[in-house]
Swiss-Prot record:
Its main location: mitochondrion. The chain crosses the membrane at residues 33-53, 77-98, 113-133, 178-198, 226-246, 288-308, 320-340, 347-367. Gene3D superfamilies: Cytochrome Bc1 Complex, Chain C (1.20.810.10). It is a multi-pass membrane protein. GO terms for molecular function: metal ion binding; ubiquinol-cytochrome-c reductase activity. Heme b b562 binds at H83, H182. Heme b b566 binds at H97, H196. Component of the ubiquinol-cytochrome c reductase complex (complex III or cytochrome b-c1 complex) that is part of the mitochondrial respiratory chain. The b-c1 complex mediates electron transfer from ubiquinol to cytochrome c. Contributes to the generation of a proton gradient across the mitochondrial membrane that is then used for ATP synthesis. The gene is MT-CYB. InterPro entries: Cyt_b/b6_C (IPR005798), Cyt_b/b6_C_sf (IPR036150), Cyt_b/b6_N (IPR005797), Cytb/b6-like_sf (IPR027387), Cytochrome_b (IPR030689), Cytochrome_b_C_euk/bac (IPR048260), Cytochrome_b_N_euk/bac (IPR048259), Di-haem_cyt_TM (IPR016174). Heme 1 (or BL or b562) is low-potential and absorbs at about 562 nm, and heme 2 (or BH or b566) is high-potential and absorbs at about 566 nm. It holds the Pfam family Cytochrome_B. This is Cytochrome b. GO terms for cellular component: mitochondrial inner membrane; respiratory chain complex III.
Length: 379
């Protein structure tokens, strides 16, 4: 009798994806972030569902309903902070996951990579709309500033912005539709994540050496299931440390003030995970140029596979490219810092230089360095 795990139509899919899946024997902890992102998504959907049971998406009661969740609902405070800090953990895992893909050349799996880029955009949109829901000062002004960027689109811009707002400013209609989208998008993300995995399992995982691992595979279970469980425990440990000891560390104090259209906060800034893109947006004096740079700062990932000039897939044996990669990481940290600073000297100049360097590394320096390394191999 054959094992039901291998014959049952549903169990078979799970078996081929998480149990009998042949995996390279040498994948490191950098390959843990896919499963961690899955756990983050499940956690966000679970906590979000319980928050939605008590939240009201009306401008007059939204702020009070969040206060009510924290004060009156049983364990409402922990659900709310797990959801807010869960988003931060989600983005930390996302950035590390994308960074891993860049370092080890995983972008050569073009379908998986492109679905991943769509996932990144969708998660960013979801997080942005979620930030608007508590209807604090930063929620309101963040929504106003970011949606207003669309007015830079020639000819249809102004009409488009008012269509998204559902009126002449960010108001009741905007909040209601943002809540509706924020609720539905995580389920779309789940579907996209399955497509992401489907494409990945067509080719199999990459590995740190960047070479084929067809001759050296091990079953996913128990080897990588136990490794993933360790990663999940660490993730939960860090998340609960944040939630229970410093829940507001990554938030903005301005969001504890109810939204007031008549009073603009001195420094409008998004959540920390958008600051690098926000810094790139602000470093260009032209509105349309800034919006284009903002979109391209993420969309540039789509052309990375076409800029791969190296004879090797991974950066493991390419010290010059490694230096550039870590320079890029440092540059993104500088951009994140600049995004949270006021628009004044010297921050403007630093932001402009960091933005130029960001595009320079990805578009010019990395492909050139790869060619130099190819020639060094001949020596």
């Amino acid at each position: 009798m054959t094992n039901i795990r291998k014959t049952h139509p549903l169990a078979k899919i799970i078996n081929n994806s998480f149990i009998d899946l042949p995996a390279p024997s040498n994948i490191s902890a950098w390959w843990n972030f896919g499963s961690l992102l899955g756990i983050c998504l499940l956690l966000q959907i679970a906590t979000g569902l319980f928050l939605a049971m008590h939240y009201t998406s009306d401008t007059t009661t939204a702020f009070s309903s969040v206060t009510h969740i924290c004060r009156d609902v049983n364990y409402g405070w922990i659900i709310r902070y797990m959801h807010a800090n869960g988003a931060s953990m989600f983005f930390i895992c996302l950035f590390l996951h994308v960074g891993r893909g860049l370092y080890y050349g995983s972008y050569t799996f073009s379908e998986t990579w492109n679905v991943g880029i769509v996932l990144l955009f969708t998660v960013m949109a979801t997080a942005f709309m979620g930030y608007v829901l508590p209807w604090g000062q930063m929620s309101f002004w963040g929504a106003t500033v970011i949606t207003n960027l669309l007015s830079a689109i020639p000819y249809i811009g102004a009409t488009l912005v008012e269509w998204i707002w559902g009126g002449f400013s960010v108001d009741k209609a905007t909040l209601t539709r943002f809540f509706a989208f924020h609720f539905i998008l995580p389920f779309i993300i789940s579907a996209l994540a399955m497509i992401h995995l489907l494409f990945l399992h067509e080719t199999g995982s990459n590995n740190p050496s960047g070479m084929t691992s067809e001759s050296d595979k091990i079953p996913f279970h128990p080897y990588y299931t136990i490794k993933d469980i360790l990663g999940i425990l660490l993730l939960i440990f860090i998340l609960m440390g944040l939630v229970l000891f410093m829940p507001d560390l990554l938030g903005d104090p301005d969001n504890y003030t109810p939204a007031n259209p008549l009073n603009t906060p001195p420094h409008i800034k998004p959540e920390w995970y958008f600051l690098f893109a926000y810094a790139i947006l602000r470093s260009i004096p032209n509105k349309l140029g800034g919006v284009l740079a903002l979109v391209l700062s993420i969309l540039i990932l789509a052309i990375i596979p076409f800029l791969h000039t190296s004879k090797q897939r991974s950066m493991t044996f390419r010290p010059l490219s490694q230096c550039l990669f870590w320079l890029l990481v440092a540059d993104l940290l500088v951009l994140t810092w600049i995004g949270g600073q006021p628009v004044e000297y010297p921050f403007i100049t630093i932001g402009q230089l960091a933005s130029i360097l960001y595009f320079m590394i990805l578009l010019v320096l990395m492909p050139t360095t790869s060619i130099i390394e190819n020639n060094l191999l001949k020596w």
